[in-house]
Amino acid sequence: MSRRHAAEKREVLPDAKYGDRVLTKFMNNLMIDGKKSVAERIVYNALDRVQGKLKREPIEVFHEALDNVKPSVEVRSRRVGGATYQVPVEVRPSRREALAIRWLIDASKKRNEHTMEERLAGELADAVNGRGTAVKKREDTHKMADANKAFSHYRW
């Protein structure tokens, strides 16, 4: 553990089309091998597909989907006297957002539509409607935390 102060967070620039910082973070997470233009094209085309599907403003749909995937509690392992307990802890806002983004992208990659645009559009639409793999991941995380509520006094 470093004794120096924590590294300061760098602020990402808002994206070109919607002027949204969270969308830029999403694109950066989706990006492979530094190919940002490819990631941008995938995200923008997916948002256009979602707009056609749901007849709503794409950036609103994106944020609603993200909110439906954000976990409020998670479990962290804690060793106490030779036993390891799964202790439920509240998730801080920055991690909440990061987890939601990661889960949406992972769930999209595992879908079986033909292109990544279709997969991402499908996962976003499902997340808005409260179903889909990413939402299930959040529900499972909450269930784990609820099941281990008895160990919440081991919080640190």
From Swiss-Prot:
What is a single cellular component term in the Gene Ontology annotation?
small ribosomal subunit
Q: Which GO terms describe its molecular function?
A: rRNA binding; structural constituent of ribosome; tRNA binding
Q: Which CDD domains match?
A: uS7_Bacteria
Q: Which UniProt keywords apply?
A: Ribonucleoprotein, Ribosomal protein, RNA-binding, rRNA-binding, tRNA-binding
Q: Is Endoplasmic reticulum among this UniProt entry's keywords?
A: no
Cross-referenced Pfam families: Ribosomal_S7
**Subunit structure, as described in the record:** Part of the 30S ribosomal subunit. Contacts proteins S9 and S11.
Q: Which HAMAP family match?
A: Ribosomal_uS7_B
Which NCBIfam families does its entry note? rpsG_bact
Describe the task this protein carries out. Answer: One of the primary rRNA binding proteins, it binds directly to 16S rRNA where it nucleates assembly of the head domain of the 30S subunit. Is located at the subunit interface close to the decoding center, probably blocks exit of the E-site tRNA.
Protein name per UniProt: Small ribosomal subunit protein uS7
Q: Which organism is it from?
A: Paracoccus denitrificans (strain Pd 1222)
